[in-house]
Amino acid sequence: MRKLGFIILCLCTAWTAFGQSKLDLQSQMMLLQIRNTAIPTYNSRTRSFERPREVQQNVMAMVEFMGQNALDELDAQGAKVLRVRGDIAIVMMPTADVECIAELKCVRRLELSRPVYQKMDIVRKTIGIDKIHQGIDLPQAYTGKGVVTGIVDGGIDPNHINFLKPDGTTRFGYISKITATTTTQQGYLYQNYYPRAVLDTMKQQDNTYAIEDFATDSYTNFHGTHTSGIMAGGYKGNILAAKTDDQNLSYNVTVPNLYYGGATESEIVASCGDLRDQFIAFGVDDIINYSKLSGPKRKPCVINLSLGSNLGAHDPNSVMNRFLSLCGEDAIICVAAGNEADNTVALTAKFDKADSTVQTFVRPMIEGEYKTAKKTYYNLRNGQICAYSNDADEFELQIVVTNSARKNKVAVRIPVAENTNGQPVIYSSGGDYAINGAVVNSTFAKAFEGYVSAASIKDPETGRYYVLAQFLTSDNQTTNKDGNYKLGLLIKSKKAGQRVDVYGDAQFVYFDDYAQEGWTKGSRNGSISDMACANNVISVGSYNVRNHWPSLDGYVYGYNKQGEGNDFPVGEASRFSSFGTLADGRNLPDICAPGASVISSVNTFCVTNPDMGYTSAALQAKFEKGGKAYYWHQSLGTSMATPVVAGAIALWLEADPTLTYKDVVRIIRQTAVKDEYVKNTGDPVQWGAGKFDAYAGLKQVLLEKGANGIQGVKTEQREMPVLTMTGSRSFTAFLAKAKQMNVRAYTLSGQLVHSQVAQGNEININASSWEKGVYLIQVNGSPAQRIIIY
């Protein structure tokens, strides 16, 4: 009877679907898109716009719930609970019942899943990981032993040699694969993979397989293998690598692998499949559960998320960001800042008085023709735009079509004058874009083929008023071939002191003024990924360490175009690296790490896929063994910078497994390098605290927590000093917990040649007057260590 009553309730309230205040606006617009097969969506795999053949029967959602019986009530109403963290549940529910489930008394907020996008030789040396691996003047070498390095990504090849132990067994402890599908009643497929040796000890379970039999989750994507390799790749055997002596031509040599990662002996855990935010949350939860339950005691864990989206409130209070924040209490989570700062994909309007107006154009990233498999578009504008007030107060937003031939006079106005409670206003050109409930406007059709929709609501997630616009337009080649008709936004304040933050999804459009008077250009500040705005996560930007590389085809390539200057100056912040000043006052990212460009392992199945068109020009190294070829190549992005930090944090966690997010982020900021590039180039917000320094961070960990590793081993009862050569005739000495440094240098015959005392735990020694040779260095009476002065 209860379920029957629920169905009757759904039928009675379906007509008010857009008035549900517990369902965020983006989810409401997503439901409109799912249920209306006339609306085309972009398929990134086929690189075309496609209309769904049928309505999706089930959807995944996050529910923020309340009450002791909430989970039972959700289950009783057809929402299958998959995961729970705090007061947030990941559920699968029928598409037809979303609004009704949102109205249950036990539901505080409900959010549907939304797409996110994937966003080391020089690197290791630059941030000091090589020193840590070698244990140079450290109590011991740190390689991530006993630490779980987790990753959620796509394009993972877990049997790449970079992830195998020297005996050929896998370093992966567990992989989960989550994909949406119409072939199961649940609407998704959840598969689990374990090492065969572990699987053989388990009872037979459905959808559980051996990691050794896993090929890849994607034959068209290398990303996850690349990021995993940066974070935790450990193969150090021989490879065939390209080398150059003149930055023009290259030659191939067999050398020990240069391109292994940070936590070379860590235990790797991954989640892959469809890249939607709630599938990602599912994967993060899987990794944390593994770190808690896979051994006799909990293992320290760091998780890399080289994923994100620029859409969203950029607020820590969204359901997804609250979930990540809760996960950040159980693992150190590193999130990519994003790669959208190349374009002005954000805009912040601050109004001194009421009835003030800011206007901007929605400009296509690809101007002119854009060919897909099925259709050619002209000045394609596609995607979503969110505009948020700084509080619950409304503002007025109009989507306009202007005519530059008539001094940008407005030809069509699509107004969102006040709160529509989620009810969309839709304008369409008709024809192929005939949408139920849309206004077919002849002037709009003269300008574009396509549609524009917009709706507004007081956001149940953040309490802020906002407008969401969704659109797909292509210039009409009969009546707008010259592109005079353009799409724009007009934002009008309703009170003094109002702030409106506008974010594009950074896929096909950005905000520009076309050099027109009275119009406003967008900003790079605000390009930060929404997921990076969660509390208890470390957001990572990118700086440049390489702008050219030798390839296996005999040539050297780079990103810099001949005669056009240096696009990626070594040492500077990468121009694409996203950043933002949020409405709550925070500046992100937290830190920058090497991300342009980084050479790492890549998915063999992607490289060998004929449709991908790989040649030796795209590859920097390869190795063949047992009939399988393995490859390495360069890539760039905050996706690459983030696992640099995650891998280094695994080394810190080996040194001190008790480190928390607050410890790690404080040490990152405290030990960041602020060199001349940080001080004098780029936007200060884009740099965060500066450049990440893994070695200085580890020294600080040792200083605060001592040199205890996971196994509780100390090389000496007494703390050992750290000696670091800073030149051929100079070095520093560091001793954790020391208040005064007393350094003595002796020849091998025992003659004292130098004595120096300083306050603190670190001292600089100038050996320029010493004879060449080997010296014994004693710090505070510790056992002597050898150094060589050249």
Q: Model-predicted segments: where are they?
A:
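Subtilisin-like serine protease catalytic core
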Residues: 136-279, 296-299, 328-330, 341-345, ...
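Catalytic-core environment of secreted peptidases
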Residues: 184-212, 404-405, 439-440, 452, ...
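Autoinhibitory N-terminal propeptides
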Residues: 5-8, 17-139, 148
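C-terminal subdomain of the subtilisin-like protease fold in secreted/lumenal serine endopeptidases
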Residues: 47-51, 251, 291-294, 300-309, ...
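C-terminal tail/sorting-segment detector
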Residues: 772-790
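Substrate-binding/access-modulating region of protease and related hydrolase catalytic domains
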Residues: 272-351, 371, 379-396, 402-411, ...
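Hydrolase catalytic cores
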Residues: 228, 236, 240-248, 269-273, ...
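N-terminal domain-start motif of subtilase-like serine proteases
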Residues: 28-55, 97, 118-168, 205-222, ...
